[in-house]
Each structure stands twice: as structure tokens, then as C-alpha cells.
């Protein structure tokens, strides 16, 4: 009986984890793109981060 419950929990956990892995791929790629944009702006001498005091209002957005 305990083995059956254990097996059910393991299978349920495995099935539930697959959709969440594939859903995060698109969001992760989008976040990487934003980071690369920020680094490019930083190399050009512009800072789009709010901590910079809003010096640059046209930050490629």
C-alpha cells in the first residue's frame, strides 16, 4: 500500500514538472534579450536604470 502511494506521488510530480519547464524557456530567452540590450546601452555610455537619475529618457524602448 505504501509503495503504491509513493509511486503515485513520484509519477504525479514528474508529470507536473514537464509543462512548467517548457513554459519557462520563452520567458528566460526574453530576459536574456533584455540583459543584452542593457549591456549594449551601458557600453554606449547610457544608463537606463532608474538609479541613474533618469538622465536618458530614450533608452531604446
Swiss-Prot record:
GO cellular component: extracellular region
Main location: secreted
Key word Glycosyltransferase present: no
Gene Ontology MF term list: acetylcholine receptor inhibitor activity; toxin activity
Tissue: Expressed by the venom duct.
Pfam families linked to this entry: Toxin_8
Note from the entry: Found in injectable (milked) (IV) venom.
Entry remark concerning the domains of this protein: The cysteine framework is I (CC-C-C). Alpha3/6 pattern.
Protein name, entry field: Alpha-conotoxin CnIJ
Native species: Conus consors
Amino acid at each position: 500500500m505504501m509503495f503504491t502511494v509513493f509511486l503515485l506521488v513520484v509519477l504525479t510530480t514528474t508529470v507536473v514538472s514537464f509543462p512548467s519547464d517548457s513554459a519557462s524557456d520563452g520567458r528566460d530567452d526574453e530576459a536574456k534579450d533584455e540583459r543584452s540590450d542593457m549591456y549594449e546601452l551601458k557600453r554606449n555610455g547610457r544608463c537606463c536604470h532608474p538609479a541613474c537619475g533618469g538622465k536618458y529618457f530614450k533608452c531604446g524602448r
